[in-house]
Amino acid sequence: MSLTPRQLGEQLRQRKQRRQPIAVLTAWDALSASWAEAAGVDLVLVGDSLAMVALGHATTLPVTLEAMVQHTAAVERGLRHTPIVSDLPFLSYQCGPDQAVAAAGRFLKETGCAGVKLEGGEPETIAVIDRLVRSGIPVMGHLGLTPQSVHQLGYRRQATDPVAQERLWQRALELQQTGCFALVLEHVPAELATRLSAELSVPVIGIGAGEGCDGQVRVSADLLGLTPQQPPFSPALLDGRELFSQALRQWVQGVQSAPVPPANHSAPHC
């Protein structure tokens, strides 16, 4: 990558200061990475959503650290200059700072990514982020709807009452103070996200959090209409499933309807 981890954080902060919206797309392999870069994104996120998009799981929970490292390396090979941030998957950092440093270190050493993303803002997570940052590993935070907590919180909208909003606000401030270079806010009220974006000095990247954030992130497969179920806050821009299926169906039907060539037209045996 052309940007070092430190340069990535500085570049994103400069875009925030200049009020230049930040565009982030996910990728899960070299091909999807090349699509994102051709579109001109500022940052590629290798999200643990690849568990659902590429590996067929119902949630993000089953994806392993090994799989995330492998897919992140593939994404890196599909890019020329766009920086990468990768998700630390479920149970790769929840056991404590030592585990988190070992896991995050693999991404920086083996994949060329510029940082990692962690979900949550509980005291235990803050301690993990503090250790990562002090170890020289850039961290992007993630609050609101956190898919790794699906069994506790579900996929419903988060921070919808004053108590929950105050808790999210304080956690966002803690993440910034601990050293996160950016923050993802997912599926929270737009007014709250707008106020937080104005309050924080680090960029706030929204998904389902309104248009008042410093940038937006989307799962590429959702935008392309490739996933069977669309999140309500991430509508598709085209019906990719139907377009791809139609093209493949046309080829299959052409093969199946073609006349079988006579035996003497087959290639000679060597």
Swiss-Prot record:
Pathway: Cofactor biosynthesis; (R)-pantothenate biosynthesis; (R)-pantoate from 3-methyl-2-oxobutanoate: step 1/2
Function: Catalyzes the reversible reaction in which hydroxymethyl group from 5,10-methylenetetrahydrofolate is transferred onto alpha-ketoisovalerate to form ketopantoate.
Compartments where located: Cytoplasm
The entry's keywords: Cytoplasm, Magnesium, Metal-binding, Pantothenate biosynthesis, Transferase
Cofactor: how and how many bound: Binds 1 Mg(2+) ion per subunit.
Classification lineage: Bacteria, Bacillati, Cyanobacteriota, Cyanophyceae, Synechococcales
InterPro entries linked: Pantoate_hydroxy_MeTrfase, Pyrv/PenolPyrv_kinase-like_dom, Pyrv_kinase-like_dom_sf
Gene name per UniProt: panB
Binding site for Mg(2+): 48, 87, 119
Family the entry assigns: Belongs to the PanB family.
SUPFAM superfamilies for this protein: Phosphoenolpyruvate/pyruvate domain
UniProt-annotated binding residues for 3-methyl-2-oxobutanoate: 48-49, 87, 117
Listed NCBIfam families: panB, PRK00311.1
Reaction catalyzed: 3-methyl-2-oxobutanoate + (6R)-5,10-methylene-5,6,7,8-tetrahydrofolate + H2O = 2-dehydropantoate + (6S)-5,6,7,8-tetrahydrofolate
Active site (UniProt): 186 (proton acceptor)
Protein name: 3-methyl-2-oxobutanoate hydroxymethyltransferase
Organism: Synechococcus sp. (strain RCC307)
